[in-house]
A protein has these predicted regions:
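Short-chain dehydrogenase/reductase
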Residues: 1, 54-55, 103-106, 110
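Catalytic loop of short-chain dehydrogenase/reductase
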Residues: 8-12, 16-62, 74-75
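Short, small/polar-rich loop/turn modules that mediate ligand/substrate recognition or access, typified
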Residues: 12, 62-66, 117-119
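Hydrophobic structural elements of the Rossmann-like NAD(P)H-binding subdomain
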Residues: 16, 67-70, 119, 124
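Short C-terminal tail/terminal secondary-structure segment
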Residues: 27, 34-36, 107, 118-131
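A glycine/serine/threonine-rich, flexible loop-to-helix segment
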Residues: 27-36, 69-91, 101, 131
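A conserved structural motif in NAD(P)-dependent oxidoreductases
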Residues: 91-102, 113
């Protein structure tokens, strides 16, 4: 909120926040069975809060600035095989994401091609949220 006066001084452009599918959906705890991994409540709460903050900010700094969020699905980063296999089996594209999978949607939201898009959260999750 302290930055709002600076943003209101005629800045133009796009802000793209990176949230998570766990800011939208609850965890599937069966994925974590037999692993040391977890899904902290604070992570889900902060990502859900970031999505709502993006909406709030879009209604506050528009029309000169657009604000959107991207919610990635699971990114392959050396997770245990059991987790990865269960995750991929539950994802329609049958794989976890790489960081490269998000560049297209971020570039779109940052560009003028999305000039009428603000206050949105786009899930990029290989279809995870389609079930």
């Amino acid at each position: 909120q302290a930055a709002l006066p600076f943003l209101a001084r005629g800045a133009h452009g796009s802000i793209v926040n990176v949230a998570s599918i766990y800011g939208v959906l609850g965890p599937d705890w069966s994925l974590y069975e037999g692993t040391a991994m977890g899904n902290p409540a604070a992570y889900a709460a902060s990502k859900g809060g970031l999505i709502q903050f993006s909406r709030w900010l879009a209604t506050t700094v528009g029309p000169s600035l657009r604000v959107n969020a991207v919610s990635p699905g699971g990114v392959a980063r050396g997770q245990p095989d059991a987790f990865r296999q269960r995750y991929e089996a539950r994802t329609p594209l049958r794989r976890m994401a790489s960081e490269e999978d998000f560049k297209g949607v971020v570039a779109f939201l940052a560009s003028d091609a999305s000039s009428y898009v603000t206050g949105q959260n786009i899930l990029v999750d290989g279809g995870w949220s389609s079930w």
